[in-house]
Amino acid sequence: MPPVLLQAEIIRAGPNIDEGQLVIGVAIPWFEIIREIAKDPKCRFQIPWRKLEELIAGAYEREGWERVILTPRSGDRGRDIIVEKHGIGSIRIVDQVKAYRPDRRVKADDVRALLGVLTADPNISKGIITTTAEFAPGIIEDSQLRAFMPYRLELKSGSELVKWIVNIYNMEFRGHC
């Protein structure tokens, strides 16, 4: 991946609010980074953690969520991105993003920590952990964690992340060019 893409602004930031900064759009480098990932999914491991959070926040914005919030770099209380849809059946999701190397796994304790965030805040509908890597063996089968999946808890592995963002990219350009 060309380093210049990782130095560029990839989201259009709106005003700061109590929980962080609103994301109101994506910039051209966002599309270019997704295109690079589509060509070589392993390049996702080159993305610094904050840029990965921005990339994922941009994906939620492009997916049509009404409100996308990128939380501060520190003091986010286990919430990297907050997305909301309002109206009948309002939804509020927190996404905890893990920019891990290919050999590092998200552990069960990380997943349990997110469940703690869910139970402490009654306004959260669902928690997602999105990682560039994979989850430790046994997490998906863990009966205590499984009870929350898929309606309250979602675990998005690196391969699922790639599929998700490339699909959003392809939806943007279907029928163009």
Q: Which ranges hold each PLM region?
A:
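Mixed-charge (Asp/Glu-Lys/Arg
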Residues: M1-C177
